[in-house]
Amino acid sequence: MLMQEERELVVEYGKKMSAARLSTGTSGNISIYNAEKGLVALSPSGMDYFSTTPEDVVILDLDGKVVDGKRKPSSEWALHTTFYKHKPHARAVVHTHSVYCTTLAVLGEPIRAVHYVICLLYTSPS
């Protein structure tokens, strides 16, 4: 099976994400990018992480073409591949829907930086 290790990691961390209540049900998605192969292992669409197996994980190229897998890739595949195209050092994307983050988003209130390290991560949108 193509990208076996990456598939296993997507499943493992999907279960951890769900157990930590960072996402519920089938929400959220995880991908791992193998730059050497130019391929992405992406969680499948509409599956609970606790029932997902490595065989369910979809392998696609950076244009979204499914290379291996029988499942439909996450509907957020373009979000993941965009990160890998524009941030060459990125090797994984975790997109969650935690209750607290969703609540803050719905409130529409700004979230202030509370630690200097956040400034180190900022890059100008030039």
Segments the model singles out, each with a brief description of its role:
Residues 100-108:
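Short active-site loop/helix that positions an aromatic residue
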Residues 99, 111-120:
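Ligand/cofactor pocket segment of small-molecule handling proteins
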Residues 122-126:
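Conserved small/polar residues in nucleotide/adenosyl-binding loops
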